[in-house]
Swiss-Prot record:
Extent of the signal sequence: none
Source species of the chain: Macrothele raveni
GO molecular function: sodium channel inhibitor activity; toxin activity
One Pfam family recorded for the sequence: Toxin_23
Cellular component, GO, one term: extracellular region
Note: The primary structure of the mature toxin is identical to that of beta-hexatoxin-Mg1a (Magi-5) from Macrothele gigas (AC P83561).
Residue stretches in coiled coil: none
UniProt subcellular location: Secreted
Protein family per UniProt: Belongs to the neurotoxin 15 family. 01 (magi-5) subfamily.
Protein name (Swiss-Prot/TrEMBL): Beta-hexatoxin-Mr1a
UniProt entry tagged with the keyword Secreted: yes
Biological role: Insect and vertebrate active toxin. Binds at site 4 of mammalian voltage-gated sodium channels and shifts the activation voltage of the mammalian rNav1.2a (SCN2A) channel to more hyperpolarized voltages, whereas the insect channel, DmNav1 (para), is not affected. Causes temporary paralysis when injected into lepidopteran larvae at 8.6 nmol/g. A low intracranial injection dose into mice causes lacrimation, closure of the eyes and sweating. A high injection dose causes extensive lacrimation and death.
Tissue: Expressed by the venom gland.
Entry note about domains: The presence of a 'disulfide through disulfide knot' structurally defines this protein as a knottin.
Length: 29
């Protein structure tokens, strides 16, 4: 699956939909 907004991440491919990985957290663009 994918990681939701505000979940910890290492890269943007881990995050759901349009979310980007910023500062180690999935953030909406």
């Amino acid at each position: 699956g994918c990681k939701l907004t505000f979940w910890k991440c290492k890269n943007k491919k881990e995050c759901c939909g349009w979310n980007a990985c910023a500062l180690g957290i999935c953030m909406p663009r």
